[in-house]
From Swiss-Prot:
Protein name: ATP synthase subunit b
Pfam families according to UniProt: ATP-synt_B
Organism: Nitratiruptor sp. (strain SB155-2)
GO cellular component: plasma membrane; proton-transporting ATP synthase complex
Matches recorded under InterPro entries: ATP_synth_b/b'su_bac/chlpt, ATP_synthase_B_chain
Residue intervals passing through the bilayer: 5-24
Name of the encoding gene: atpF
Keywords, ordered alphabetically: ATP synthesis, Cell inner membrane, Cell membrane, CF(0), Hydrogen ion transport, Ion transport, Membrane, Transmembrane, Transmembrane helix, Transport
Assigned protein family: Belongs to the ATPase B chain family.
Amino acid sequence: MKQKLLMLLLLGSVSLFANEAAASGGTDIIPRTVNFLIFAAILYYLAAEPIKRFFQERKEGIAKRLEEVEAKLKEAKEEKAQAEAELKKAKELAQEIVETAKQEIEILTKEIKEQAKQEIEMLEKSFEESMELEKRKRVRAITKEVLEELFEEKALELEKEKFVNLIVKKVA
């Protein structure tokens, strides 16, 4: 409180005495200019270095931050390019896998068809052989039956032609 009162008193006296030179007919511009230059020199001496240092540090901080941002941007661009390259490789690999799968499907389909065809041929051949075997068995059985009938009837004498006709009738 005392400081405020002292300041107010000093400022009031300055304003009262400032008019004195003008009232007496003289000017005090030269002493005021010298006082201002001394004040400016002291202010420059005391404040110039901290102000310069502040702005230099600010400039360096901004430059450093800019470099960091540029480095991050460059890194992000490189990562993006790398990700795009990996995506492209993955797409190519997927396309190759699809093509390979299609080719394998075609090959497997052909193999399965060929195997089925061979199995059908084998079954047909087996069936034909089985039919032939059954036919032979039937012919033998019929022949055996006819011969047994003939031998049982010894009294009956047959000629060769009748015998052959009889066998043919039984077989047919």
